[in-house]
Curated annotation (Swiss-Prot):
GO terms for cellular component: mitochondrial inner membrane; mitochondrial intermembrane space; mitochondrion; TIM23 mitochondrial import inner membrane translocase complex. Belongs to the TIM21 family. The keyword Hydrolase does not apply. Participates in the translocation of transit peptide-containing proteins across the mitochondrial inner membrane. Also required for assembly of mitochondrial respiratory chain complex I and complex IV as component of the MITRAC (mitochondrial translation regulation assembly intermediate of cytochrome c oxidase complex) complex. Probably shuttles between the presequence translocase and respiratory-chain assembly intermediates in a process that promotes incorporation of early nuclear-encoded subunits into these complexes. This is Mitochondrial import inner membrane translocase subunit Tim21. The lineage of its organism: Eukaryota, Metazoa, Chordata, Craniata, Vertebrata. InterPro entries: Tim21 (IPR013261), Tim21_IMS_sf (IPR038552). Residues 67-98 are annotated as: Disordered. Keywords: Membrane, Mitochondrion, Protein transport, Transit peptide, Translocation, Transmembrane, Transmembrane helix, Transport.
Length: 248
């Protein structure tokens, strides 16, 4: 009996061991398979990671590019806005006829004002040139007559060496320009001047009367006469030049 019991126990142990081996065998096989396939899986994962990383970076860069640049809808809207702005600007440049007429009238007015100013300036320059350089100007006649008075011996004997001339004297004592008179006789121009002289001799003063006549041959103006009236005592007249006899 004991022997049979021991044999039964041994048989059950064998059965238990065989069942355990059977249960462990698939696990071991799976483990080996996993160990065999792990490098390939790891390589596959690395390859996938390596291949996926650029895709992710490209995706990110694509996203950043699209976010930085305008969207197609916004580009269309901006283009339509620019076109509308250009059209409005072109439409705004069109000037109505009334505005053109106003601008033309204003330009014509400015032109008239400019021409008027030029004419006035030209007249002033002509007057100044005539007064300073023309032989028929009163200032020129006055200067020539004064030089003849300064060089005349009788005038020097009465008034002294330094003889000076001046025009009319106002109530305030200011000396004005030389008085003159112009007229035309027998088609020839005549100019008469009147001024005053005084010299180094105290209390001596004289009045000068001079007249010029246009010479038809040369166009110059020649003296007809130059007189000096001494106003102090004794009164007398100094004849510096008298050409009136040549008129006959």
């Amino acid at each position: 009996m004991i022997c049979t019991f021991l044999r039964a126990v041994q048989y059950t142990e064998k059965l238990h061991r065989s069942s355990a081996k059977r249960l462990l065998l698939p696990y071991i096989v799976l483990n080996k398979a996993c160990l065999k396939t792990e490098p390939s899986l790891r390589c596959g994962l690395q390859y996938q990671k390596k291949t996926l990383r650029p895709r992710c970076i490209l995706g990110v860069t694509q996203k950043t590019i699209w976010t930085q640049g305008p969207s197609p809808r916004k580009a269309k809207e901006d283009g339509s806005k620019q076109v509308s702005v250009h059209r409005s600007q072109r439409g705004g440049t069109a000037v109505p006829t009334s505005q053109k007429v106003k601008e033309a009238g204003r330009d014509f007015t400015y032109l008239i004002v400019v021409l008027f100013g030029i004419s006035i300036t030209g007249g002033l320059f002509y007057t100044i040139f005539k007064e300073l350089f023309s032989s028929s100007s009163p200032s020129k006649i006055y200067g020539r007559a004064l030089e003849k008075c300064r060089s005349h011996p009788e005038v020097i004997g009465v008034f002294g060496e330094s003889v000076k001339g001046y025009g009319e004297v106002t109530r305030r004592g200011r000396r004005q320009h030389v008085r003159f008179t112009e007229y035309v006789k027998d088609g020839l121009k005549h100019t008469c001047v009147k001024f005053y002289i005084e010299g180094s001799e105290p209390g001596k003063q004289g009045t000068v009367y001079a007249q010029v006549k246009e010479n038809p041959g040369s166009g110059e103006y020649d003296f007809r006469y130059i007189f000096v009236e001494i106003e102090s005592y004794p009164r007398r007249t100094i004849i510096i030049e008298d050409n009136r006899s040549q008129d006959d």
